[in-house]
Amino acid sequence: MYKLCAVLFALAVPAVRPHGYLSTPVARQYKCFADGNFYWPDNGDGVPDEACRNAYKKVFHRYRAVGAPPGEAAAAAQYMFQQYAEYAAVAGPNYRDLELVKREVLPHTLCGAAANDRHALFGDKSGMDEPFHNWRPDVLYVNRYQRAHSFNVHFCPTAVHEPSYFEVYVTKFTWDRRSPVTWNELEYIGGNGSGLVPNPGDAFCASGQLYSIPVSVPYRPGPFVMYVRWQRIDPVGEGFYNCADLVFGTENDECRYARAAKAVRDQLRQQNLCNDCVEAGPQESCAPTRPQRRAHNYLRRGGAHDQQADGASVRETIDEL
């Protein structure tokens, strides 16, 4: 039944079929596409990102190894990036049977939507499943008291499909990023409450509308993957599957040094030791620079001229940040 549905789908749809992709967080394949420079040279040496280059070369050399000319092997690898909005698979009318989907529709190559044959309907996108150590993550920020991050996932449709529904997963706490993503390593975190809304200004989505899916992502100590399924409700059972790389950052860690530097400037002004200090603008980065680290250490030592009372009060302020 599954193979028959796939054949009927191939006959029924037009040649141009892209439908959508994760834009917040950003899907692996879209990052590779957006970087560009994957058309020359054929072997992928021009791909700027290391992980994307590794994915390209995986597909390219797979077909070169069986005698495909460089141009054909390159076309297979380029297709993986070009079709960033068509990471799709066909489940048939039993698309709600998740065990069927796991067993027969996507038993492997989850990030590539089980596409691992350049001669098949959806091509070969297996490079997206390379367990490379350096896939670029989007950052989710939490403070020291949070064990999860709540936000709206955005799925950017190049063609709207209604009715439909979403399922959102993240890799488990124990997942090793040196291993590919498998169903056994995924934890379901939601998908209910999704809605088609006006694009609120998502920089990675050019569509006027997008799907917004509220989720709460549990904390992970290292890099992890979000896996999203967008499933059409129709007899063909076409679904779209995307991986996005994530890591948690701590707002306190990011901004601590910038705020410490501001506290130093304020203290020096109060003591008339720095009348010409320049106030940082609102866009001051939270990334700790060397002067900001020195400012932090300065406050830890007690402030200007070791004036203990003033220094102590500022230290208490820093500890509260």
Swiss-Prot record:
Oligomeric and partner information: Homodimer; disulfide-linked.
Species name: Orgyia pseudotsugata multicapsid polyhedrosis virus
Descriptive protein name: Spheroidin-like protein
Residues modified by glycosylation: N192
Leader sequence residues: 1-18
Gene name of the encoded protein: SLP
Protein's UniProt keywords contain Methyltransferase: no
Matching InterPro entries: Cellulose/chitin-bd_N, GlcNAc_Chitin_IntDeg, Ig_E-set
Keyword terms of this UniProt record: Disulfide bond, Glycoprotein, Host membrane, Late protein, Membrane, Signal, Viral occlusion body
The protein's role, per its UniProt record: Component of the virus occlusion bodies, which are large proteinaceous structures (polyhedra), that protect the virus from the outside environment for extended periods until they are ingested by insect larvae.
One GO term describing the cellular component: host cell membrane
Localization per record: Host membrane
Keyword Signal listed: yes
Chief place where the protein resides: host cell
Region (Disordered): 301-321
Gene3D superfamilies listed in its UniProt record: chitin-binding protein cbp21
Source lineage: Viruses, Viruses incertae sedis, Naldaviricetes, Lefavirales, Baculoviridae
